[in-house]
Amino acid sequence: MPRLLEELTAVILTHRDAPLDVVGSFESRVGEAYQILRGVVDEAVVLATCNRFEVYALPRRGFVETVIGFLGEASRYARILHGMDVVRHLFRVAAGLESAIIGENEILGQVARAYEEARRRGVAGKYLGLLFSQAVRTGKLVRSRTRISYGNVGAPGAAVKLAREAAGGFDGKHVVVVGAGEAGSIMASLVREEAPTARISIVNRSVDRARELAGKVRGEAYGLDMLPKLLAAADVVLVAVTVNEPVIKRSMLEDVGRHLVVVDISNPPAVEQPIPSNVYYAGLRDVEKVIKEVLAVRIREVPKAEAIVEEQVALLRKLWLKRGADEAIAEIMRYANRVMEEEVEELVSRLRGLGVDGAALLVARSFAYSLTKKLLRPLILYAHEAALEGSLSKLEEIAQKYRDELARRQH
């Protein structure tokens, strides 16, 4: 049955309108959400992340009230969108334009996985399949045609960028990563991705954690006691630790006796000041400056990204209307074929009674098929024109009449 684009509805709760802890509390409740949607949707997809909880649906009666009830007190922060506003919002989400950090990439995978989960649960049909596949396509197009995802706006990524530029790349270099926590892990992974031939040494208070990370990046693991020896052989040092006093002393750096690149994103700093002249040093302020520069590039790309989104929103509208027209035509053809089959069977029966041979009967059947198609051709052309003009509601009325008539004939 064709569904009008105007029926498309979404209940939106995001970081832009609600406190993060409120939004994040629904991230683990996707299963509950699908449970309460039973009976109030024909199709649905739940998109839940730490920054957003969104329910997209082709609704039945009571959908909005059910979702609002599920949100409870958080419902005062929710927005309800319909039709093209739903399409535009989802496409902007997939493009990274609605993210807390403009252009972040993770959301694109989250949108794709949300649809796959809905499909696995049997609640995402062909219409939301079309919507979400086009949303993912839009997100990819925006990222390939603009610099909306330029650079890395996380401190670890920015630190690696600074170190790369200062050292002239990492290939063939000895990179020491001090700290095996989340930030250290990101930095070590980025270095390995960029430089297959780099030697990576992981230094951490807990050698077991250092070994765990080293195993992931094809590196070596050491305790803090090995720092002086490792610094003497290092080309680049990346630091991300939580300490009360510096773990890299000025004397250690002076003993190196040659050029060394050190980037420290620890707060407070983990490298003792002042820095010797043989060391290129970048701290958290330098890293934050890089992040601001990256964000400035991304922000300049927003108008281009928005233009692509609008192009794809218009395309989705055409695809949706065409799908509706195809379904309406299929309804009409089902009715026409049923009537034709009945009439042909009656004609064949009569002709047999008149002694008409088998070849003539085949001709009669072929003629009936051809006549049916020719008679319906103007209606089919009208259906496609109506879809392009957005007149799907009238077409649906026509299809419904054929559907009702077919049901009557079957009974």
Swiss-Prot record:
Chemical reaction(s) catalysed: (S)-4-amino-5-oxopentanoate + tRNA(Glu) + NADP(+) = L-glutamyl-tRNA(Glu) + NADPH + H(+)
Written domain comment of the UniProt record: Possesses an unusual extended V-shaped dimeric structure with each monomer consisting of three distinct domains arranged along a curved 'spinal' alpha-helix. The N-terminal catalytic domain specifically recognizes the glutamate moiety of the substrate. The second domain is the NADPH-binding domain, and the third C-terminal domain is responsible for dimerization.
GO terms under biological process: protoporphyrinogen IX biosynthetic process from glutamate
Function field: Catalyzes the NADPH-dependent reduction of glutamyl-tRNA(Glu) to glutamate 1-semialdehyde (GSA).
Residues flagged as site, Important for activity: H89
Gene Ontology terms for molecular function: glutamyl-tRNA reductase activity; NADP binding
Gene symbol of the encoding locus: hemA
Keyword Transmembrane helix attached: no
Protein name: Glutamyl-tRNA reductase
Residues reported to bind NADP(+): G179, A180, G181, E182, A183, G184
Active site per UniProt: C50
One Pfam family recorded for the sequence: Shikimate_DH
Record keywords: NADP, Oxidoreductase, Porphyrin biosynthesis
Other observations noted: During catalysis, the active site Cys acts as a nucleophile attacking the alpha-carbonyl group of tRNA-bound glutamate with the formation of a thioester intermediate between enzyme and glutamate, and the concomitant release of tRNA(Glu). The thioester intermediate is finally reduced by direct hydride transfer from NADPH, to form the product GSA.
Top-level EC class as recorded in UniProt: oxidoreductase
Stored InterPro entries: 4pyrrol_synth_GluRdtase, 4pyrrol_synth_GluRdtase_dimer, 4pyrrol_synth_GluRdtase_N, GluRdtase_dimer_dom_sf, GluRdtase_N_sf, NAD(P)-bd_dom_sf, Shikm_DH/Glu-tRNA_Rdtase
Entry EC number(s): 1.2.1.70
Binding site for substrate: T49, C50, N51, R52, S99, E104, N105, E106, Q110
Family named by the database record: Belongs to the glutamyl-tRNA reductase family.
